[in-house]
């Protein structure tokens, strides 16, 4: 490996003579080999033949020749980089040519799935891109995708490399391909303001304007970041300004992010100001109560437009006179000012020392850098450019910036936690833009004006998406339960026209009551940990007593230590990077596939502060494509606030210390005035709300209700056990609970639930891997010490016995009569979330299978058709008003006490499922998504778009499914609004629930479902076929989701539902005295094997292998209800 290591190093550093020398040994070796052929054949002459003859009979010479053999030109280092990767990334054109002449392959991917073409496109070197495409022994595939499903065109478009984009378009690169975040190259160019690239893509492919998703459009992305020219070009090209996504129209995005100029452009283009987002808010509603000056100006613009006036209040193009930044800091001590001047000087010295560096990849050129590029951070120039833009927003023209030949990649916006932790807002109210704005006064050099400064709002809190769940993150912008539920009241039960296709193959559905569903959260489903909902963000009663220490994320240190705090108070410089504006360091990931999963999901964390000489400190940024994470979500996303609230509680010491300062609130006001005056539109209200979470936890329930203006409900909450603010989180207090305790106003219920989302969730029992040592300590952690005696006297003396509790025992045995206390207990049981009717049946291990399976083959609603209820035991609580106490009043249903007695007498083994790889021979995964109990007693809810249904005249297995997917997808491309439904999956079938009013639309029995498959052209689209028992016709129902992982999980959950039904049937048949002669056969055919999408999967890995056209070669996955457990037969009901 010695010579190969030398070749890698020479290619990386561009040492052409070394590369040629090393590869000449390879040619020499090949010459000896050729002569050997002649010598061994007896006809070779000359030295070559002689050498070959000796080599064939002499082992020592053979060994000598092997020493002369050159290195493998396609060798790789620890990151999977070949010499060609290194040369392409670092722009060494001559080295690339030599490598290609020596048979270097262009189709070798590194560990992140990147090909040399990706790196050259990202670098912006059009010459190397041409070489890779047209030269070499292998044919470069221009549409090859990396692990993030990005093509070379994505890389070039994101960073504005117009020459590379031109070359790739000439080579017929597909511009409609989407990465893992469903972004096309046009989306990325619009997101980062790459105007020329946007024009080139639209000129080459005008149809890109119609290739939009419900998640975003190029217009939304450009409006969000204030790219005026890009917005204008898109509108001129014919993009619909009223196109709606989850966030509403582009006007919502521009207004929310304070882009006044874009708002004016959109209003002039005739954008409908009455469009509402998924929360039912118009753009005007979104900004009306925001406290920043810019938000008020935007609200005035929209109001003037609505009243038909031509704005006389139009925002003045020239910002109001700004006080000098030095004078704006009069409230800071002289010592602090001295520290700031010192920090500014050192920062500028550091900038000047690096002014000659070429771009954001300079660290990759250094000969001393390691081969593993994961650890490399880039330098200064990109951040310098972006901070120059921010300085412009402050009305100051930054100077000393040298022009660049190619546009730099956009600066990665600093996450809010980092910004607020690095610069204590009380004692260092300077942003990076303010620091740089002092530079002209120090250097006196000419300034450079730029047109746009789109990233000014990215310093505000909550502009990024933080997902703190596992790698299979489902990017649901909002949970279904967060939607407005007013429309659920008084529904007439009629099925909307757009859902009529779902009735094919559906069981009869009785009218559902007025109460909406509270759908179960699926085990694999996650919710973004962003900011609280808009309604909770705008409470005017939020006070200004928060601390200057920003609440850190879960992955960051919880509070500043005392030494750092002393440093702030005394004005003494500290070496910790948090106390200096120049150390805004971000996670580095140096190539297009370089972001790790945590980085991609937005859960960025800063490296632990290190003490370095200040001369070594640099503004660093991530080179990963994932810096768009901060730009793809707004501050109004639903929040899962548990971890954030927990970290807030850790800041109480720092809070108390800083609140002792008498000028604390006034200085916050001063800081907000400064930020507002420089036109950055920074909204501090959300940060204050997060910090105020600490104060909220110290309030009583009455004080908390008073803070949200609902103090009239204090007695109702207290009398029903909702008596502690620490235990009012979203996993305890739900809408049905508020109905039950007498809060009838839906607006008030929604307001209460929104406010409760900012409270911490009840921690699940054993959430940290350690169960409480005793029942008393567990109850004490829940604030329920009064029940200790009741638990112990009733035999619940260990944590294991507590885990087997259900609500019936809490009421009848333990006498926990208060609803809030019961909800608190059940919420702490991690494996059984309380989103079920009050009469929860025992866990599956406590129930005999045959007691359930008498209704397996019955229609889903058959047993309850006369009572007007659905037969699903555990659909969520909102469906029929808690089922009017369900089985307790159903004479046909056995009581839980009786079933528990049967279980004690005849204990059954817990249901065991075959793994997917055994249940389906071609399944690529090894485990199911859920516990069997989830599909038996509960339901798995998924949100999806319903594209429609199609009659299948000639059933050809999954081929019919895939054909229907393609046809329905094309037919709905131009639909402005696609209906949203919720799929509620159990072992009995699938229920379809209208997401807008939570009414059940249709039910498909498990026995009537077959041929579930993904669309091979769009893995977010899937479908299955049902059989209409009345007409014997087959219908294919087509759905789409916003995430490939979610689509995969839905199909896998359907497969698990078949497996559960199959195993239940087997156990029921075993338990009968006389076995049944035969059981009904159920078959479902999944798609061709679709490997589980991962961050590390390229598109080529997602493409199914070619197979024959028989049933098994279609990867049929059959869950067979058969008396023989080992039966391999598969009878189709089609």
Curated annotation (Swiss-Prot):
It comes from the Eukaryota. Residues 33-57, 305-338, 375-422, 469-498, 569-650, 856-896, 1079-1134 are annotated as: Disordered. Keywords: Acetylation, ANK repeat, Cell projection, Cytoplasm, Phosphoprotein, Repeat. Residues 305-317, 382-392, 613-628, 1123-1134 have a biased composition (Basic and acidic residues). Residues 328-337, 572-588, 633-650, 856-868 have a biased composition (Polar residues). Residues 936-1091 form the PID domain. Phosphorylated on tyrosine residues in response to EGF and PDGF. The keyword Secreted does not apply. Pfam families: Ank_2, PID, SAM_1. The modification Phosphoserine is found at residues 507, 620, 622, 624, 626, 628, 647, 661, 663, 666, 677, 887. ANK repeats lie at residues 79-108, 112-141, 148-177, 181-210, 214-243, 246-275. It is found in: Cytoplasm; Cell projection. One of its GO terms (molecular function) is ephrin receptor binding. SUPFAM superfamilies: Ankyrin repeat, PH domain-like, SAM/Pointed domain. InterPro entries: ANKS1/Caskin, Ankyrin_rpt, Ankyrin_rpt-contain_sf, PH-like_dom_sf, PTB/PI_dom, SAM, SAM/pointed_sf, SAM_ANKS1_repeat1. Residues 33-55 have a biased composition (Gly residues). GO terms for biological process: ephrin receptor signaling pathway; neuron remodeling; substrate-dependent cell migration. The modification Phosphothreonine is found at residue 318. Widely expressed (at protein level). Its main location: cytoplasm. Regulator of different signaling pathways. Regulates EPHA8 receptor tyrosine kinase signaling to control cell migration and neurite retraction. This is Ankyrin repeat and SAM domain-containing protein 1A. It comes from Homo sapiens (Human).
């Amino acid at each position: 490996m010695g010579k190969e290591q030398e070749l890698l190093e020479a290619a990386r550093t561009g040492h052409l003579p070394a590369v040629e020398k090393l590869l000449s040994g390879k040619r020499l070796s090949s010459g000896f080999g050729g002569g050997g052929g002649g010598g061994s054949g007896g006809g070779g002459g000359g030295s070559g033949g002689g050498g070959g003859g000796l080599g064939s009979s002499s082992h020592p010479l053979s060994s000598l020749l092997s020493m002369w053999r050159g290195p493998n030109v396609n060798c790789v280092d620890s990151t999977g980089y070949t010499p060609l990767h290194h040369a392409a990334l670092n722009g060494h054109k001559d080295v690339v040519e030599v490598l290609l002449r020596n048979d270097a392959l262009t189709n070798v991917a590194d560990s992140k799935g990147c090909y040399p073409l990706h790196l050259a496109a990202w670098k912006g070197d059009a010459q190397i891109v041409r070489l890779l495409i047209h030269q070499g022994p292998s044919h470069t595939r221009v549409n090859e995708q990396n692990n993030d499903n990005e093509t070379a065109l994505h890389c070039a478009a994101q960073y504005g490399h117009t020459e590379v984009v031109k070359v790739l378009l000439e080579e017929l690169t597909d511009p409609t391909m989407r990465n893992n975040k469903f972004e096309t190259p046009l989306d990325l160019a619009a997101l980062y303001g790459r105007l020329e690239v946007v024009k080139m893509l639209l000129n080459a492919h005008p149809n890109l304007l119609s290739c939009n998703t419900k998640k975003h459009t190029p217009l939304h992305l450009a409006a969000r970041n204030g790219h005026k020219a890009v917005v204008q070009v898109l509108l001129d090209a014919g993009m619909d300004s009223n196109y709606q996504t989850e966030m509403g129209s582009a006007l919502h995005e521009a207004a929310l992010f304070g882009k006044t100029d874009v708002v004016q452009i959109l209003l002039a283009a005739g954008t409908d100001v009455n469009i509402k987002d998924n929360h039912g808010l118009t753009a005007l509603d979104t900004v009306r109560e925001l406290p920043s000056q810019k938000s008020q100006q935007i609200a005035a613009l929209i109001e003037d437009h609505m009243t038909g006036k031509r704005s006389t209040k139009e925002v003045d193009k020239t910002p109001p006179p700004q006080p000098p930044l030095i004078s704006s800091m009069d409230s800071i001590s002289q010592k602090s000012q001295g520290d700031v001047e010192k920090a500014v000087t050192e920062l500028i010295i550091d900038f000047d020392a690096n002014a000659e560096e070429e771009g954001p990849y300079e660290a990759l050129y250094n000969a001393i850098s390691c081969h593993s590029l994961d650890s490399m951070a880039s330098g200064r120039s990109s951040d310098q450019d972006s901070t120059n833009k921010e300085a412009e927003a402050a009305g100051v023209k930054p100077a000393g910036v040298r022009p660049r030949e190619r546009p730099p990649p956009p600066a990665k916006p600093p996450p809010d936690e980092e910004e607020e932790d690095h610069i204590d807002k009380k004692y260092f109210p300077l942003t990076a833009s303010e620091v740089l704005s002092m530079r002209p006064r120090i250097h006196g050099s000419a300034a450079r004006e730029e047109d746009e400064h789109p990233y000014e709002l990215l310093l505000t809190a909550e502009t990024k998406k933080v997902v703190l769940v596992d790698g299979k993150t489902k990017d649901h912008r909002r949970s279904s339960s967060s939607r407005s539920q007013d429309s659920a009241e008084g529904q007439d039960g009629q099925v909307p026209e757009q859902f009529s296709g779902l009735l094919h193959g559906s069981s009869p559905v009785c009218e559902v009551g007025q109460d909406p569903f509270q759908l179960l959260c699926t085990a694999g489903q996650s919710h973004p940990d962003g900011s609280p909902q808009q309604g909770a963000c705008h409470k005017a009663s939020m006070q200004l007593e928060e601390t200057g220490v920003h609440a850190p994320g879960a992955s960051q240190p919880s509070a500043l230590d005392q030494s750092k705090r002393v440093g702030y108070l005394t004005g003494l410089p500290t070496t910790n990077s948090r106390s200096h504006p120049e150390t805004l360091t971000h996670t580095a990931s140096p190539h297009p596939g370089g972001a790790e999963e945590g980085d991609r999901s937005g859960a960025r964390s800063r490296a632990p502060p290190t003490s370095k000489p200040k001369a070594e400190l640099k503004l660093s940024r991530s080179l990963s494509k994932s810096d768009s994470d901060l730009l793809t979500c707004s501050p109004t996303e639903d929040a899962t606030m548990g971890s954030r609230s927990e970290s807030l509680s850790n800041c109480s010491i720092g809070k108390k210390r800083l609140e002792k300062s008498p000028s604390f609130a006034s200085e916050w006001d001063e800081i907000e005035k400064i930020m507002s005056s420089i036109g950055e539109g920074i909204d501090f209200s959300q940060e204050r709300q997060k910090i105020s979470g600490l104060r909220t936890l110290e309030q009583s329930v009455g004080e908390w209700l008073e803070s949200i203006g609902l103090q009239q409900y204090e007695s109702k909450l207290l009398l029903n056990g909702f008596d502690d603010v620490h235990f009012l989180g979203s996993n305890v207090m739900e809408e049905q609970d508020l109905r039950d305790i007498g809060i009838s106003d839906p607006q008030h219920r929604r307001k209460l639930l929104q406010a409760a989302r900012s409270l911490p969730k009840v921690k699940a029992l054993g959430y940290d891997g350690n169960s409480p040592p005793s029942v008393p300590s567990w109850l004490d952690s829940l604030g329920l010490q009064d029940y200790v005696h009741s638990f112990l006297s009733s035999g619940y003396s260990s944590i294991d016995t507590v885990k087997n509790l259900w609500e019936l025992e809490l009421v009848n045995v333990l006498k926990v009569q208060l609803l809030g206390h019961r909800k608190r207990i059940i919420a702490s049981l991690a494996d059984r979330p309380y989103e079920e009717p009050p009469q929860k049946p025992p866990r599956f291990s406590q129930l005999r299978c045959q007691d359930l399976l008498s209704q397996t083959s019955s229609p889903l609603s058959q047993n309850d058709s006369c009572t007007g209820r659905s037969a699903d035991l555990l659909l969520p609580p909102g469906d029929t008003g808690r089922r009017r106490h369900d089985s307790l009043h159903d004479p046909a249903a056995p009581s839980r006490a009786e079933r528990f007695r049967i279980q004690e007498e005849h204990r059954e083994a817990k249901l065991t499922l075959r793994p997917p790889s055994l249940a389906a021979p071609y399944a690529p995964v090894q485990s199911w998504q859920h516990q069997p109990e989830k599909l038996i007693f509960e339901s798995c809810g998924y949100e999806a778009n319903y594209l429609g249904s199609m009659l299948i005249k000639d059933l050809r297995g999954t081929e019919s499914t895939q054909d229907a997917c393609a046809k329905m997808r094309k037919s709905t491309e131009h639909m402005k609004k696609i209906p949203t439904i919720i799929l509620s999956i159990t072992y009995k079938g699938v229920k379809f629930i209208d997401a807008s009013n939570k009414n059940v639309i249709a039910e498909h029995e498990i026995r009537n479902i077959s041929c579930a498959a993904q669309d091979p052209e769009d893995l977010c689209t899937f479908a299955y076929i049902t059989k209409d028992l009345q007409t014997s016709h087959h219908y294919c129902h087509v759905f789409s989701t916003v995430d490939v992982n979610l689509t995969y999980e839905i199909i896998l959950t359907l497969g698990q539902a078949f497996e559960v039904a199959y195993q239940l049937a087997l156990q029921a048949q075993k338990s009968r005295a006389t076995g049944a002669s035969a059981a009904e056969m159920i078959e479902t055919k999944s798609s061709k094997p679709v490997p589980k999408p991962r961050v590390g999967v390229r598109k080529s890995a997602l493409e199914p292998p070619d197979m024959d056209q028989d049933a098994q070669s279609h990867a049929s996955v059959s869950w067979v209800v058969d008396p023989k457990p080992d039966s391999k037969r598969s009878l189709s009901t089609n």
